[in-house]
């Protein structure tokens, strides 16, 4: 991930998408569905078009937004996790920690809540959607379907 100090990494500008699109292209060429981008110190920053979460020991862990756009979906997942009593940590994640995670998933407008099966051909957890990812995914889908009154403020109904 291109560091903020080399440009305007926190601006939602067309020029900032080139790095992500090239990473996605390289990932697809290598046989993967998505790319994980790392910051200038080698920690996971985000996916090419989504935020990244892992689950370890019952807690959600997601990188800070030091070098990425702030995400409404990421913030919503953090809020839903609090409602579900799931602890959330905002801290750096090493590539090696991803390999030993219990679960992992992407979040974003297009990704919504997408479970991750493997990273670098290493199976994450049991190799399928884990129980915490399932809880978060279910709560998120209820939210966007208007089934959770607490989050009605997030919805705009269109006739």
Predicted features, each with a name:
Residues 1-159:
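Helix-start/capping segments and mature chain N-termini
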